[in-house]
Amino acid sequence: MTHQELAYHYVQHTNRCIFLTGKAGTGKTTFLRRLKQECPKQMAVVAPTGVAAINAEGVTIHSLFQLPPQLFLPTDEARRQLFAEMQMRANKQRVLRNLELLVIDEVSMVRADLLDTIDAVLRHFNHRPTIPFGGVQLLVIGDLFQLSPALFCGAMKM
């Protein structure tokens, strides 16, 4: 069994979070395309930028989770404010509640606060506040030696 077959089997038959990494040209995108075609799980593919989302045939993180472009403080008050201001349509909430597998491509570009916010949103909408990512399986893909998280001007001043 090849490494890709083993990873595919692991995604299909477990609910564990997985980090898939490799240098450019090692088959990460090919693996993702196969997974999208063959995996029966309810899946969403996201990426931190529009270009990365297009390449992964997904959407941006901010689009799926209806997040504003800002830094997110890991406090209870900040989360309460985020959920109070969040205007997520019922169909988008349904997508998050039915989600079994969340694929984050180009994870090296995702800031830690954004990953923490994804966790909080999934816990909130799945009504599973004590389970990481609301029980949704996470597959993060990327090369940590490539691109680092992008910061906007306001974030760099903090």
State the predicted function of each range:
Residues M1-M158:
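Conserved ATP-binding/catalytic motifs of P-loop helicase motor domains
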